[in-house]
Regions:
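GNAT-family acyltransferases
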Residues: 1-137, 158, 199-226
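Exposed regions on extracellular, virion, or secretory-pathway luminal proteins
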Residues: 101, 113, 172, 179, ...
Length: 226
């Protein structure tokens, strides 16, 4: 972890198709992950649930109101696929999600093999910093490297960033390894970082450079390149 549309056939057909991005909405993919701007409130809640368990929060350090605290609800959400219409799902969760104007982009990730919610990716397009997390069922399978490679791709090819940055706790060997496998290299940065829950931890930093960069139409007006 770093800071920073109940049937299988139906779920697959409702997934965003990789290609040109629409205004305010982005889609990126790797070999095993499809990541996209949430389409529904369910997508958004599943993205949050993916990083709400105790193991993830050891590293992420979100505030209590920023996580899905109920373990049974987390498990239910992370067994689902976009487009599922389970009777247990509240109707308001199927309402469309409209992206805001915040500096940070949030993408929800699903596995391409079974369509299950599996990850979340963030990119702050003012600082060029990316971050993300995997659901418990997606950890230990090399998906972290794909997730961070997607973060670099989003920064370089969607927002025109020359450099994408990432930071993690110094003792988080799994995250450091995933960043290195994704093509990030060690970089200078503050020796400590304060998590959102107030904990101060030792930090280590990475950067990802690129050749030609580009901006997709979903990125809106031009911004300074980081």
């Amino acid at each position: 972890m770093v800071w920073a549309p109940l049937r299988r056939r139906r779920a697959v057909t409702l997934l965003p198709v990789p290609g040109p991005c629409a205004l305010g909405r982005h889609t990126v993919h790797t070999e095993r992950l499809l990541l996209y701007t949430p389409e529904t409130q369910l997508d958004l809640l599943a993205a949050i649930a993916a990083g709400s368990d105790a193991e993830a929060q050891r590293w992420l350090g979100m505030r209590g109101e920023e996580v899905v605290a109920d373990a049974r609800l987390r498990e239910t959400l992370l067994r689902m696929r976009p487009g599922d219409n389970d009777r247990k799902i509240r109707r308001e969760l199927l309402v469309a999600f409209e992206p805001g104007t915040e500096a940070a982009e949030l993408l929800v990730g699903v596995r391409r093999d079974n369509g299950r919610y599996a990850a979340a990716l963030q990119l702050d397009h003012t600082t060029g910093q990316t971050g993300g997390w995997l659901a418990p069922h997606g950890r230990g399978q090399g998906l972290g490297a794909e997730l961070f490679a997607a973060g670099a791709l989003l920064g370089h090819s969607h927002f025109g960033m020359d450099t994408v940055h990432a930071g993690t706790e110094a003792t988080n060997a799994a995250c450091r390894g995933a960043l290195l496998r994704a093509g990030f290299v060690p970089a200078e940065g503050p020796p400590t970082h304060t998590l959102r829950d107030g904990r101060e931890i030792d930090s280590t930093w990475f950067r990802h450079g690129s050749g030609p960069v580009a901006r997709c139409r979903a990125a809106g007006v031009a911004q300074s390149r980081v």
